[in-house]
Amino acid sequence: MQLTHDIQPEKIEKDRLYLDMGLSDEEFQRIKQILGRHPNFTETGIFSVMWSEHCSYKTSKPLLKKFPTDGPHVLQGPGEGAGVIDIGDEQAVVFKIESHNHPSAVEPYQGAATGVGGIIRDVFSMGARPIASLNSLRFGPLTNNRTKYLFSEVVAGIAGYGNCVGVPTVGGEVQFDESYEDNPLVNAMCVGLINHKDVQKGIAAGIGNTILYAGPPTGRDGIHGATFASDDLAEDSNKDRPAVQVGDPFMEKLLIEACLEVIQSDALVGIQDMGAAGLTSSASEMASKAGTGLEMNLDLVPQREQGMTAYEMMLSESQERMLLCVQAGREQEIIDIFEKYGLKSVPVGKVIEEKVFRIKHLDEVVADIPVDSLADDAPVYNMPSKEAAYYRAFQQMDIATPAIEDYANTLKQLLQQPTIANKEWVYDQYDSMVQTNTVVTPGSDAAVVRIKGTEKALAMTTDCNSRYIYLDPETGGKIAVAEAARNIVCSGAKPLGLTDGLNFGNPTNPEIFWQMEKSVEGMSAACDALHTPVISGNVSLYNQSKGKSIYPTPIVGMVGLHESTQHITPSYFQEKEDVIYCIGEAKAEFGGSELQHLYSGKYEGKAPHIDLDVEAERQEKLLSAIKEGIISSAHDISEGGLAIALAESLFNGQGLGAEINVVGDATVELFSESQSRFLVSVNKKHANAFESHFPEAAKLGKVTDQGQLTISISDKTIIHERVEELENLWKGAIPCLLKSKA
């Protein structure tokens, strides 16, 4: 396809060139009606990216409306670069999650790196200083050589960008499953801190005000990146490498500092990152939100390559670029700030009263489009939904409790499953301590970052067990939100809100859309029950390859507030003689569990049941006990069940052990993944106070200084292992798999 506006408009329709841009026949006819004429090549390209799923949410928008987005502390919900929640003292936390799945499948290093860069820009475009990054990653089995390559390069890309840009990577999650073999998921989250008075919006307001371009020149990288992200991943995906952007973290570091200084000037009206769809999306969205129009001259846009067409400049996704609206006559004030940081900024257009998006190039109008048709008036589709064929069969299955002969060996095998195994190989590559505010580093239930100059801190996590959501999307959606909140509470913080990263297959498949629909309903119910509004998010669809879809993976990024750093609670056992309790009861629930997969190689049956009222009550009571100072450690019981939680609580290098005695069926008690459960340790002087909070909690045993994990069932020892040996297996699993030959 020629990347030029020289192609005659009639030829675009005759040869159906718009199909290659991602537009349907019906959508092209709608564009003709909007314009009252044939669109030219540049206009067709502009519509194609703005009407892509990635930019318009045209199939997911009806579902997103189901999320609760309001709350007493929400200052900015969905609709801007990131959401904003009040944390008191005229301060707020800003956060969002974003996906970079397709680019990471094609060019994993740059795909992951630019995913980090893009989400950081979303946060500082709101006026916030980025203080932490997290990620949520999915790959195929680590026995596959291509998976090893993708895994290694994605982690290297996240580390390469994050470490250089000066924002600590403090947490995240990594899971492995066959459904992600050809379609990895790379979701990046950023958290920022802001004063209320500094909150910005991406608007182009004030007739006659100037549109300013800031950052490096525009090149040909990333053209049609938004469209690429809105289609199935092709088998010959190497041809899509030009759609992957190239990032420069050192440029971004300068851009952060320059923009945060610019934001202090009252000459600034609005600011937005040039993300997906580049100049096209930032300019048209800023005008649409302000109810204005915008005129831009592409001859003024800095260009990295010679002979770039209007089409290429408008659709380029070159990185580290920002678009600003500045008061007319005060442009030089802003230009001078950027120059101080060695960055170029130039006027490229102005705000106009007529609500059109008018683009000029080489003394010719190359696009003249009603601005709202690109944003709020983009098409929205109510997709057909059909219950997945497998779901009813799974619901009717009676999953037997696996018969275990050797409990110690089963524990060892589970500790070496890649999804459970230690992720030190990953997070050791990340700089988690830059900015010197990280209190709880990667590897705990939630990361914790202190707020300088205050007693407060922020807890943050990313969570999603996609196997549960595959088995039962509605129940799995509830569990995803509940587990994220559970992890925040275990750290001693109160959950504030969440950002959602909805990763699904092709929404034109009614069964996939049903997965989306039910997942959102489940998540929404949990958000209501746990008082955690959705303040931002991202949708990534068409995550399938060779006709095979990923498991539905709606990732939850959640942030919580510590009113005092004294309430920060570790996930590891602390001292010998501390009493160990389990809050919540285990049931024979093995559908989607790690034990089920270990013994059968499958995930099938019912997902674990969750009662949201019980979940909310237990979280509230545990948080109250933590604030009273009676909890020594708290750990969420999740993948692998109680046995894994016990082992993980000992893996802190202090030489501690535990003596545990449980009553009931050993397999159920140790390996069930029943929900709403916590493993806590309590100093024995606080045991009575704890039991008054949780009279139903099971007293399991005590912490020892013997370096042994001893588990008995009705006083009969079934596991007696050195903690050091268990920890070595847990830590060595992923490095061992990466070194092995497939």
UniProtKB/Swiss-Prot annotation:
Annotated EC: 6.3.5.3
Lineage: Bacteria, Bacillati, Bacillota, Bacilli, Bacillales
Protein name listed in UniProt: Phosphoribosylformylglycinamidine synthase subunit PurL
Protein task: Part of the phosphoribosylformylglycinamidine synthase complex involved in the purines biosynthetic pathway. Catalyzes the ATP-dependent conversion of formylglycinamide ribonucleotide (FGAR) and glutamine to yield formylglycinamidine ribonucleotide (FGAM) and glutamate. The FGAM synthase complex is composed of three subunits. PurQ produces an ammonia molecule by converting glutamine to glutamate. PurL transfers the ammonia molecule to FGAR to form FGAM in an ATP-dependent manner.
Subcellular localization, as worded in the UniProt entry: Cytoplasm
Top-level lineage group: Bacteria
HAMAP family: PurL_2 (MF_00420)
Binding-site list for Mg(2+) 1: E98, N538
GO molecular function: ATP binding; magnesium ion binding; phosphoribosylformylglycinamidine synthase activity
Catalytic machinery residues: H54, H100 (proton acceptor)
Residues that coordinate or bind Mg(2+) 2: D122, D273
Source species of the chain: Oceanobacillus iheyensis (strain DSM 14371 / CIP 107618 / JCM 11309 / KCTC 3954 / HTE831)
Keyword vocabulary terms for this entry: ATP-binding, Cytoplasm, Ligase, Magnesium, Metal-binding, Nucleotide-binding, Purine biosynthesis
Family: Belongs to the FGAMS family.
Quaternary structure note: Monomer. Part of the FGAM synthase complex composed of 1 PurL, 1 PurQ and 2 PurS subunits.
